[in-house]
Amino acid sequence: MRAISVWGLLVLFVLLVIVFSLLRPDTFLTYFNIRSILSNKSVQLLVALSVFIPMVANQFDLSAGYNVGISQVLAIGLQGQGLPWWAAVCAVLLMGAAVGLANGLLITRVKIDSFIATLGTGTILYGLNAWYTGGQQVLASLPPEFRAISGSIWIAPAPAIYALVVSLILWVVFEFLPLGRYLYVLGASPRAAELNGISAKRYITFAFIAAGMLASFAGIVLQSQLQVGQSSVGQEYLLPAFTAALLGATSIRPGRVNVWGTVLAVAVLAVTVAGLSQLGAPFFVEPLFNGSMLILAVGLAVQAAQRRQRRGVLAENAEAAGATAAPVVE
């Protein structure tokens, strides 16, 4: 049973690939289709990893999708106004960091709940995006260097390489470095973190800054793919991102959000949507599927967290019983 909960998403991913390959042998498991999935869904993975970071500390970033939206617009708009491509990229990343800082300060200093704070900042970003674009497409001549951001590295799509590198970095941070452990402690027990001298204000703010920059980077990659700015693009990445992060909490490290669980969840969602599309499913199936998966992911994540908590309580009780039963040596 433990193995099923740990590797369930991986098994599901393999089964989905096999099923869709059998149903569409000529089109599904082809280089073109695999490359298309990797390229298109790598942006989704970057957004999912951005919401994963504060979620470790039991905080939620609802501004991520709006951040992606305004970032992809600014990435082309600033270049259209004469800024070099690298300066535009740096400016967008700094904007993302500023959004994350604002979120962190609202949550840790003003004591606004993360749902409300990030929903508010996200709505502000949406309004600024609409004001900047005037509701129109933003067009500009993009240099080859910027377009190459979404090109290829060897035979792999560059966005997939970025997503893999970011995943590896976050895995190292959250599994092996004090910063990651502190954020997990803050998510599990803020009181215990306080007693151990862990500054909630500092680390939660840092988590939101990192999340904001990563969401902005996803917007930059997206703009390199689209090569046209649209104010309506970006928000649609939020729901699948939360679905992936929560669904990932049921696998690899059941009961807690984790990097590779999130990666597997994005892979499962991507393969399912691509497979259904090749089977001729209508356009509205994807949002129906994403919404259903979000509800399922929340339910499974809650159950996994409860099982993890029960195992911890049982282990503590067993340890206490062992200590009580120990013979007294006179």
How should each PLM-predicted stretch be described?
Residues 14-29, 57, 129-137, 172-178:
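Structural signal for alpha-helical transmembrane segments and their membrane-water exit/capping regions
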Residues 84-92, 98-103, 107, 154-229:
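Helix-loop-helix "hairpin" substructures at the membrane interface of multi-pass membrane proteins
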Residues 9-21, 50-51, 122-129, 162-173, ...:
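Hydrophobic core segments of alpha-helical transmembrane domains in multi-pass membrane transport
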Residues 15-23, 27-81, 105-112, 245, ...:
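Single transmembrane alpha-helix segments in multi-pass membrane proteins
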Residues 1-2, 60, 80, 97-139, ...:
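Short loop segments and helix-boundary regions at transmembrane helix junctions
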Residues 110, 114-177, 203-206, 225-234, ...:
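Transmembrane helix-bundle core of multi-pass membrane transporters
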